[in-house]
Design a protein with these regions (language model features):
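Signature of N-terminal electron-transfer/Fe-S-associated modules in redox systems
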Residues: 1-156
């Protein structure tokens, strides 16, 4: 199977029905994507496939051939949303955090609280509740929006 993973082309020789989650964790050694329920109910295994959040425990690797997959490792260690999750105490045990962060990337540039709740509806957290997570995503988008306005003013 060939696909792009975190910006790099990968070619893995695995059974086409192997779960993408297992290929990431076991075959490629990317353990940031977590298995929670294994049934697509909790969102811990969320990755982005062509920019859309998907539970990787439900996806046979054959379905990602020719696509672009982003796992939490693809963000690196310095993504602003990761820092805001820590600052707002939106992460505790860490099982849901990678999936929450990747699902949050699908939130539009000026979201309402309802937009954020909708984007994260497929992700469960047993530790923090959701207020800190929603706050982190809202602050991230506010900062991104403000920086975008500043850079457009500079270029005018």
């Amino acid at each position: 199977m060939r696909f792009t993973l975190n910006g790099a082309a990968v070619d893995v020789a695995v059974h086409p029905m192997a779960r993408l989650l297992d290929v990431l964790r076991l075959d490629l050694g990317l353990t940031g994507t977590k298995e929670g329920c294994g049934e697509g109910e909790c969102g811990a295994c969320t990755v982005l496939i062509d920019g859309e959040p998907v539970c990787s425990c439900l996806v046979p690797v054959a379905q990602v051939e020719g696509t672009a997959v982003l796992s939490i490792e693809g963000l690196g260690d310095n993504h602003p949303l990761q820092h805001l999750f820590m600052n707002e105490v939106g992460a505790q045990c860490g099982i849901c955090t990678p999936g929450m962060i990747l699902a949050a990337l699908s939130v539009g540039p000026t979201p309402t609280l309802d937009d954020i709740k909708t984007a994260l509806a497929g992700n469960l957290c047993r530790c923090t509740g959701y207020s800190a997570i929603y706050r982190a995503v809202m602050k991230w988008r506010e900062v991104e929006h403000a920086e975008g306005e500043r850079s457009s003013q500079v270029s005018e």
